[in-house]
Amino acid sequence: MEDLQLCTLYSGSKGNCTYIRAGGDAILIDAGRSLRALTQALDAAGGSMETVRAVFVTHEHADHTSALEMLAKKYDIPIHITEGSAARLLPAARYLPCRAVLHTPLYSVQVGGMTVTSFATPHDSDMSVGYTITLADGCKLAYATDIGHITPEIEENLIGAYAVVLESNHDEDMLMGGPYPAWLKSRIASDRGHLSNAACDAFLPRLYAAGTKHVLLAHLSAENNTPSRALDAACAACPEMHIVAAREGEPTRLL
């Protein structure tokens, strides 16, 4: 396997950004928080913006896009985003017309030695997507967060991946017993909301049986989950797999 790095720079409701590097080429998936926070986290992870060839956006929500404007102003890097998500950001996102590569949920592009392919995901946003990244040697990585449930399309794209970044957003008891208003609890728990620990854990044995070796649990809720709770439940569900829980405020390396 070629020189490979996969880590979340930060992950959670305050901001999301994932760094994937294969050899001398890297991509970012999402760019939440601020450009300063992003570059500081990237430096802490041992990465560099000099290697970043493109940014891939999952959807338009602020915790995934708030650093895009400053990033677009400072770096000559294409921003791959679905037509629906871009429409939601415009006209305020004046940087998009000169940087955006608009695409449908079914899209594939070559970036260095990586083939990045998008697939549709169920979330309360406009045309949200996940991504697979296939390396030159055939190794596949996959990314799926902000998903209300595991659809057949998600399963089809994640099956066979060597490593997967997968949402494990909330513990159902913590969510329902917590302080959130009823409408917000309903939104989070819906089929177009966020994936629970239990739903994530139920899928892990299927991934392992199909060859997945590494999973990074991502987009954990600070209010309705804890890294230890998510990790303990996931490891109990699939003890054979290497599983790591992303930390909200610091880089978490899977590979």
Where is each model-derived feature located?
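Structured catalytic core of nucleotide-sugar glycosyltransferases
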Residues: 7-17, 58-68, 90, 118
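Active-site environment of divalent metal-dependent phosphoester hydrolases
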Residues: 14, 61-65, 86-89, 125-126, ...
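Metallo-beta-lactamase
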Residues: 83-139
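Metal-dependent catalytic neighborhoods of phosphoester/phosphodiester hydrolases
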Residues: 66-75, 90-92, 225-232
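Conserved beta-strand hairpin/beta-sheet module of binuclear metal-dependent hydrolase folds
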Residues: 1-45, 129-145, 163
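Active-site metal-binding motif and surrounding structural segment of the metallo-beta-lactamase
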Residues: 35-81
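Active-site neighborhood of phospho(di)ester-bond hydrolases with catalytic His/Asp-centered motifs
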Residues: 29-32, 52-60, 80-83, 142-145, ...
